[in-house]
Amino acid sequence: MIAFASSLDQGGILAKNIKDAAIALQCISGYDSKDATSIKAEVPNFSEDCESSEFEHVVGLVTDLIHSFGDEDLSKNYGEAIERLEKLKIKTKEIELPNLELSLPVYYVIAPAECSANLSRYDGIRFGYRAENVENLEDLYFKSRGEGFGKETKKRILIGTYCLSSGFYDAYYKKAQKIRNLISSDFVNAFKDVTSVMLPTTSGEAFDLGSITDPVEMYKQDIFTIPANLGGLPATSVPFGEKNNMPLGIQFIGNILEESSLLNISNKFQLGEK
């Protein structure tokens, strides 16, 4: 694993089902004295908790927000997900996340800024790819980073360096951090009444490779998954529904250190049984 945006990064598990994800989470959780991001807390038995019948759930819904995007397929799939919760006799409650739509611009200021700092270590000397046939030290830096980083990575480094540069720090990075706090506060308030929040995973189905050339259009697919990273919250995504023969997904966001409850509701939803 390579640090990209330290305040946003979290390890993700790809699994066939929630139970397998719970088992994997059990293995990677816990305190590590060499990992500054780990905490000294007892690790629950996630694999047992995800199948437990002892959890009481109240799922937060943002139906009006989903409808505001004007995508009928998105609204329809979200509505069908709500119907599944009702069939499972799981309580739901409409909540407000007034700043959620600001997640995208906030993320694309904070993430590149932290990325530009984290990836500065990859200079071809101690870390990362080292170019050959160089004339001097400056040429080594230039060629190693030029050849070693991909186009998207270079783009984000440039954006991040710009946001952190003199005269722009307050206008962009500092302001983005303030809005991030508002987004986090929205979730803190929501979790006073609910145990998890249900959102679509993406705003649409996966697009064909090369079919979208505008990077902003591709970035928009992240609008529902970014809030969890901004708030430092655990989240899961399970397959649900389809569009144009491509799978769609439903996401559950849990409260801080409430992975057991999150895995439990996600498992119930995925199984679709009482």
Over which residues does each language-model region extend?
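Structural helix-boundary/capping segments
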Residues: 1-69, 79-91, 158-185, 230-274
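Short glycine/serine-rich loop/turn segments
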Residues: 1-11, 64, 113, 199-216
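Short glycine-/acidic-enriched loop or helix-start segments at secondary-structure transitions
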Residues: 70-71, 104, 169, 207-210, ...
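Short connector loops at secondary-structure junctions
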Residues: 88-107, 203, 242
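Serine-dependent amide/ester hydrolase catalytic core
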Residues: 100, 123-230
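Short low-complexity, flexible loop/linker segments enriched in glycine and/or proline
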Residues: 106-112, 214-215, 251-253
